[in-house]
Amino acid sequence: MTAKHNQYVMALDLGTTGNRAILFDYEGNIVGQAYKELTQFYPKAGWVEHDALEIWRDTKTVMQEVVQKTAIQPQQIVAIGLTVQRETCLLWDKTTGQPLHPAIVWQDRRTAHFCGELTAAGYVDEIYERTGLVLDAYFSGTKLHWLLDWVKQSKSVDPANLLAGTIDSWALWNLTGGKVHRTDHSNASRTMVLNLDSLIWDEKLLDLFTIPAQIMPEVQPSLSYFGVTDPEILGVEIPITAIFGDQQAALYAHGCDRPGLLKCTYGTGAFLVANTGQTVTRSQHRLLSTVAWTQTNRDKSLTRDYALEGSMFTAGSCVQWLRDKLGLIESAAASESLARSVDSNGGVYFVPALSGLGAPHWDMNACGAFLGLTAGVTKAHLVRSVLEAIAFQAREVVEAINQDSPAPIQQLKVDGGACNNDFLMQCQADVLGIPVERPAVLDATAQGAAFGAGLKIGWNQLQIRFFRTFHHGTISLICLQFLPMRIQEGVSVDQ
């Protein structure tokens, strides 16, 4: 046994609904984890906020809890990888470390009117050309504009003392004791102010959104050295060697390292991301062009991987809505058995627009709806129609990716809590007409962050783990493969 077998990498997965710390060993196995649920705040219709101090407190707590649970010594943790919910952003005071306003969450729609004004002023094409993003309230740029407007109205705030950032920047700043204000290319590419070609903050867009360049974090490669943790957290300094947006981390974990490979994470929303290689692919179907990840080579050159993404704002949250607001199910897991209890949706169809519609429609004003209601409809039909809507929503995006990308999608790799639902996964395979592969490890976001951090410090064994677990055509460690019904019946996909 080598010294590396007594070493561990910690993944910090700071998501929309909760924050986790997971420890991985040298073989890529999970040896322990801790989790804290995150409070959601809805101060007005269409507004969604998080308490940034709660995010940091919980991050620190889960780091300490996972060490205590596993009895691993902090000095055995040789690297940390960080992955976060994207687009969510905030401002904070760099002297006191206090947030100036609750973090505005990616689902928040308060800037939809401002987006409409920019659309009317003719900025849609220019923003897409510079950033690869659709002009929408989803992204950080308009949120930061709103926050800065709010700051101007507060006489108690010193504008010269501001720092801005997405959740990775906020977490990194706190992890390093306020010493490091940086972000990585994957998170920066979701702000709507990063130039997708030059990979630096775009001065024209900063001016458009009235964001001072000096308050923005420094941008660096996803796999690189981001500093060390404050020893007050775990008693030792631990290097932070990888940062990803959550969906890019999942893509990395699935080994989707070349064009034609696609993953879908079913969480609060559903996010389909396809690697498009080292050049930007521009979509003709309103998909997002984004940075997958970046890393520096030994000769100091930068390797960049780009992706096409279809973001769907509601997926697992639709099931939560059935549970929490309508009371149709007692748990998310109960949706599967209830959907199977009927042979069809009974003619009921659901429009999954509880937070507007994302790709490929990008309709900020769309609302959800049940269609086809009759006296014979039961709650089972309603639940089944919601699960089917998630699958058909994903099909729209896959069809758009196939039209935009020269490499056709042959299979879908999945992760996230909602993909535990076998009915949903089988429905997904049926409507796509391609196999759906669900790995044994569903924590792909955390796994991607940990693997990236480990590989950066020379844990080459993890590269072998990539190919054993996720390599195209390999299912040795796949928990379950869902085949379309027509393949099960002996009909090829091409037919």
Swiss-Prot record:
A cellular component annotation (GO) from this entry: cytosol
Annotated positions binding ADP: T16, R20, T268, G316, G417, N421
Organism whose genome encodes this protein: Synechocystis sp. (strain ATCC 27184 / PCC 6803 / Kazusa)
Binding residue positions for sn-glycerol 3-phosphate: T16, R86, E87, Y138, D246
Listed pathway(s): Polyol metabolism; glycerol degradation via glycerol kinase pathway; sn-glycerol 3-phosphate from glycerol: step 1/1
Tree of life domain: Bacteria
Name by which UniProt lists this protein: Glycerol kinase
Family membership noted in the UniProt record: Belongs to the FGGY kinase family.
Transmembrane region(s): none
HAMAP family membership: Glycerol_kin (MF_00186)
Catalytic activity of the protein: glycerol + ATP = sn-glycerol 3-phosphate + ADP + H(+)
Residues the record lists as binding ATP: T16, T17, T268, G316, Q320, G417
Keyword list, A-Z: ATP-binding, Glycerol metabolism, Kinase, Nucleotide-binding, Transferase
Enzyme Commission (EC) number: 2.7.1.30
Function field: Key enzyme in the regulation of glycerol uptake and metabolism. Catalyzes the phosphorylation of glycerol to yield sn-glycerol 3-phosphate.
Regulation: Inhibited by fructose 1,6-bisphosphate (FBP).
GO biological process, one term: glycerol-3-phosphate metabolic process
